[in-house]
Amino acid sequence: MNTLEINKDFLDSLFAKAKENPRLRQNYDLRTSAEDQSQRMLNALLPGTEVAIHRHPNSSESVICLCGRMDEVIYEEVVSYLQDGEDTIRKVSYQEIERIHLNPVEGVYACQVPKGAWHTVEVYEPSVIFEAKDGAYGEDGSEAASA
């Protein structure tokens, strides 16, 4: 059995991989196996990374900021209908309703995103977060916002 020590060198290696990644982020899977019934990961995020607005209908999400400075942004889905002749067009948009500024230096370490809440992140400086969700990967009902 190998114990994983999460230290500055480990986080620096995640940041180096994130810099090489076109998405400007890199995760590290902390699960014991792919069959685990929970999701636990570290995610190194660089400024400019774009995480699509998404939600987890079957799970809340715990987010703990180990280092850096970022916002967890919560949205509500707004549905409107437009009449175009005989056609009714359904339009979906997302309105920001809350912003949680995570910054361990300022004493704001974590947040709990409610089950089913639409959310994303805005990263101001290189940050590493620990994320945890219920359910096996791919089985938590995660879905991206429609355009």
Give the residues covered by each predicted segment:
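Double-stranded beta-helix
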Residues: I6, L14, V79-S80, G85-V105, ...
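Short histidine-centered beta-strand/loop micro-motifs
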Residues: L30-S33, N43, V51-H56, I64, ...
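Short, charged/polar surface micro-motifs in flexible loops or helix N-caps
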Residues: E35-S38, L46-E50, C67-D71, V78-V79
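Short beta-strand His + acidic residue motifs that chelate non-heme Fe in jelly-roll/DSBH
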Residues: A52-H54, E72-V73, C111-V113, H119-Y124, ...
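Glycine- and acidic-residue-biased ligand/ion/polar-headgroup-sensing regions
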Residues: N58-S80, D84-G85
